[in-house]
């Protein structure tokens, strides 16, 4: 879009029930380029600077992973447009990606407690959502991470191999989220089960 003209941006909006890990802003834009008119929906995500949902934001890594998956695999992800780390623009690093319209489970309140998935969706719709989510998860875990140069995701401070690192990260996240209170019993039970059934391979 370096030669774009007549750029117009719609009023900004944001999701109210999901997308809290980063500041999320939705907008539409139209422009002209090489004599042609274009219009597209976009998502702007800004790195959190105060309230954070996760122990580590890994903001740069999010963009790098999504870009690689979109460019080099068949995993369905939004088209990543550009990344800007100059904090003088919006006060924090941000990236812009294409928007994929649809209905997603909400976080506030959790979709298991209220909202369209619990109150309106048919059992077949819930099954489709769960199975498509599992398919996407399996597709991500089936990629050749070495050919995609995903070595930057290594977190040796949490352990020797990836599985161990991820498990220790989850444990650290519980302690970080509320140092004065242990993890919920269901989470403790899940962590214990995972520890006892960890795969015996690197």
Regions found by a protein language model. Give the residues of each.
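Juxta-kinase regulatory segment immediately upstream of eukaryotic protein kinase catalytic domains
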Residues: 1-10
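ATP-binding pocket architecture of kinase catalytic cores
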Residues: 13-189, 193, 197-201
